[in-house]
Curated annotation (Swiss-Prot):
This is D-aminoacyl-tRNA deacylase. Pfam families: Tyr_Deacylase. It comes from Symbiobacterium thermophilum (strain DSM 24528 / JCM 14929 / IAM 14863 / T). Homodimer. A motif (Gly-cisPro motif, important for rejection of L-amino acids) lies at residues 139-140. Gene3D superfamilies: D-tyrosyl-tRNA(Tyr) deacylase. Disulfide bonds: none annotated. An aminoacyl-tRNA editing enzyme that deacylates mischarged D-aminoacyl-tRNAs. Also deacylates mischarged glycyl-tRNA(Ala), protecting cells against glycine mischarging by AlaRS. Acts via tRNA-based rather than protein-based catalysis; rejects L-amino acids rather than detecting D-amino acids in the active site. By recycling D-aminoacyl-tRNA to D-amino acids and free tRNA molecules, this enzyme counteracts the toxicity associated with the formation of D-aminoacyl-tRNA entities in vivo and helps enforce protein L-homochirality. It catalyses: glycyl-tRNA(Ala) + H2O = tRNA(Ala) + glycine + H(+); a D-aminoacyl-tRNA + H2O = a tRNA + a D-alpha-amino acid + H(+). The keyword Hydrolase applies. Its main location: cytoplasm.
Length: 151
């Protein structure tokens, strides 16, 4: 169970497919989510709760002390199997540890639904589709999270 997420605090972001905007947010997070072959629903729930609870928005004193909910932000969640690219051998990444689409999509959807159940507005990309993700990093603040608690 090693779900991976790259969480980027943004002032705005959008994802397009074939020139059509399919997801768009103002201030909040872009979450790039990678699902491994070992992942399960518990991993998706854990990661969603961790993302929702992160305190990386400034309070009145300028300290990172507020969650996305307290800041009134939204999430743009994008599935990204390339987070499991392994380049330890050679120069071309191998994706053996990435979940197959039929396993990854339900866990990606579970992650999104859990964020929504926690009260967040969530926009998404399109699963297993070539997308263009545009974002404006705020800070920049970028956090790596995995369900195995490696970082």
């Amino acid at each position: 169970m090693i779900l991976r997420a790259v969480v980027q605090r943004v002032s705005r972001a959008r994802v397009t497919v074939g020139g059509e905007v399919v997801g768009q947010i103002g201030p909040g997070y872009v979450v790039l989510l990678g699902v491994s072959r070992e992942d399960d629903e518990a991993a998706a729930d854990y990661l969603a709760e961790k993302v929702a609870g992160l305190r990386v928005f400034e309070d009145e004193e300028g300290k990172m002390n507020r969650s996305i909910q307290e800041a009134g932000g939204a999430v743009l969640a994008v599935s990204q199997f390339t987070l499991y690219g392994d380049v330890r051998r050679g120069r071309r990444p191998g994706f053996d540890r990435a979940a197959r689409p039929e396993q990854a999509e339900p866990l990606y959807r579970r992650f999104v639904e859990r964020l929504r159940a926690l009260g967040l507005h969530v926009e998404t990309g399109r699963f297993q589709t070539h997308m263009e993700v545009e974002l404006v990093n705020d800070g920049p603040v970028t956090i790596l999270i995995d369900s195995e608690k490696t970082f």
